[in-house]
Amino acid sequence: LTSGGTINGQAQRQEITASSFISSGGTLRIPSNMWVWSDSTSTAALTIDIPCTIINDGKIIGKGGTGGYGQYPASGYSGVGNGSGQDGGPAIKINSSVSGVTITNSSGAYIAGGGGGGGASSVEPANTYAGGGGGAGGGTGGAGGGVGTGNNGGSGGALNAAGSQYIVPSGVAGINSA
């Protein structure tokens, strides 16, 4: 950070707070080569806690939501999301006690909340369970869940994310045992 309020020398910063870089009434410029991100859907990438001006020439992105878990409804599997993807996180939070904030998003820059995680699916009678993909911003893919399983999902990412897939063979744990 220079005395003028520009973040320099780093390609990315995690979960920043305006008052850590500028004084009240100051201007914080996020340069075009900068990514500001969050690793938590409950924490914004940029928290504004003072009156200020933010000029975004870069990218401010929230954490992507976790993908849902694929499951057969009768299996009793209760993974996170229970088949539904989770919400993504915010890109920017302005504290409720703060007023006098101006945000300018330059051409080519973006401010994006994390994408919601994809929902899961299960197919009967083939017993194929596919977890949903994680949301943009780094959400984790959901697991495919068969009877008695707890498969881990794949890692998410800004470009793509996928969960695991699990196929229950006929006759396992009484499923398709005809």
Locate each region found by the language model.
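Glycine-centric low-complexity repeats
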Residues: 1-114, 118-178
